[in-house]
Structure formats: C-alpha cells, structure tokens
C-alpha cells in the first residue's frame, strides 16, 4: 500500500484515555510476569495504532502545510500529544516498579527500563500546558519555513527548491540565490524572533519546573540519550578539537 493510500482517522481521545486506564489498571493487578507481558503486548499494539494516526496526520501536514484539514489535525495532536505522554509515563512507572521486573527484563530487555527512567525525568503532569504551547510554537515555525515563497529568476520557489541555486557552480547565480533567501528571512525576522524568544522562555520554564537549572539537561532526556550524557559529549568535542582538527589540517596541507 502506498503512503497516500493509507487510511486516516483521528483518534478518539475518550476511547484512548479509557484504553490507557484499562491497561494501566490491569498491569497493576497482574498476578505474574507472564500476565504483565501479555498486557504489554496489547499495549504495543494499541500505542502503535495511536502513533500511526498521529504520524499520518503530521506527515501529511508537513507535505502540504496549506491543507486546512491536516492543519487542524496537526493542531489537535499538538494539544493531545502531551496528554498521551502523561498516560505513557504513568504506564511506564507501573512497569518500572513491577514486582516481576526480572521476568519483564528477560522479555523486553533492560534498555526499555532505562528509557522509562529517562522519560520519567523529562515529564510531569504540571508541565502539560507548557508542552502544548511548545508544540504550537514549533508548528508555527515549521509552517513559516514550509510556506516560504521566494521570487527568483522570474519564478517562485520554496526554500528546498532554492538549494539547487545556492549550490550552483555559477558563482553569480549562487550569490543571487543566497540574497533572495536572505531577503525572505529578513521579511519574517520579527516573527522568527518572537517564536524563538517564546520557545526559549517556555523550555527554560519547563526545565525549572522539573528541577533543572536550564533546558540542556532536560533536552538530553527529551532526546532519549540512554548511553551518553552532556559531559561525555563535551569530552568528545574536546577530543575533536585537540586531535581530529589538527589531523584534518595536515591532510589539507
């Protein structure tokens, strides 16, 4: 089946919440690891269906940000996404604290529980309104970029199509292309600045409400970095500067 042929239906949040609550409650009351594992398999199927609907809507919105139907669907998921995250975290906590943890680890792996631990560090019900605002700001920026119309050489292009001119072997054509793209960004500078300012304040507030000094640590958790941290990345950058850059310079010489 082609992507364009995949059927889409908006999720029913009332039914979604009902199913999450049922899965969470049954997991809490399970009498064995085997029973919890079977419920977990149901959870995988259920969340896969929910995620498929969300991804279909978001991708189709990205393909054509002027499509009013999928714009409304995107706005809907911007709102309900953090609520779904709340149920995901609640279920994850039940699984994480399971008395049958050893059995579950043998079935779904230890990494799953490491990811649950990270997810718990990146979420709390109290930041749902901030997460909804963050989603809306991100969608607003994406639309601003996707709907760019740039007059160039007698035609009108979007940012993606301008890249072929920006990388042209013709130096003068490249210069004109970069000038045209720069002019577009200058025309929307105020809006981009507003989005950026609100996003920084939003994410900083999320981090502080979760007990972090700034968004950096929270950002690593949000990216689900389960095998390295900020200090390790800093060390990697340091090694690149000390060893790889001099080596690359010698190659160029």
What is the predicted function of each stretch?
Residues 1-253:
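A well-structured
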């Amino acid at each position: 089946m082609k992507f364009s042929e995949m059927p889409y239906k908006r999720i029913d949040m009332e039914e979604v919440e009902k199913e999450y609550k049922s899965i969470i409650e049954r997991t809490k009351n399970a009498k064995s690891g085997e029973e919890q594992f079977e419920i977990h398999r149901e959870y995988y199927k259920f969340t896969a269906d929910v995620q498929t609907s969300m991804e279909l809507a978001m991708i189709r919105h990205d393909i054509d940000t002027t499509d009013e139907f999928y714009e409304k669907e995107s706005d809907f998921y911007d709102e309900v996404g953090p609520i779904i995250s709340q149920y995901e975290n609640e279920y994850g906590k039940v699984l994480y604290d399971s008395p049958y943890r050893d059995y579950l680890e043998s079935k779904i792996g230890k990494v799953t529980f490491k990811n649950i631990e990270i997810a718990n560090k990146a979420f709390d019900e109290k930041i749902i309104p901030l997460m909804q605002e963050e989603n809306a700001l991100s969608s607003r920026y994406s639309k601003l970029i996707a709907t760019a119309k740039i007059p160039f050489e007698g035609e009108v292009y979007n940012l993606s199509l301008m890249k072929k001119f920006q990388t042209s072997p013709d130096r003068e054509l490249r210069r004109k292309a970069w000038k045209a793209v720069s002019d577009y960004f200058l025309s929307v500078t105020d809006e981009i600045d507003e989005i950026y300012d609100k996003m920084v304040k939003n994410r900083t507030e999320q981090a502080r409400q979760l007990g972090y000094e700034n968004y950096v640590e929270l950002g690593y958790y949000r990216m689900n970095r389960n095998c390295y941290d900020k200090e390790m990345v800093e060390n990697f950058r340091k090694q690149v500067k000390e060893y790889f850059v001099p080596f690359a310079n010698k190659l160029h010489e």
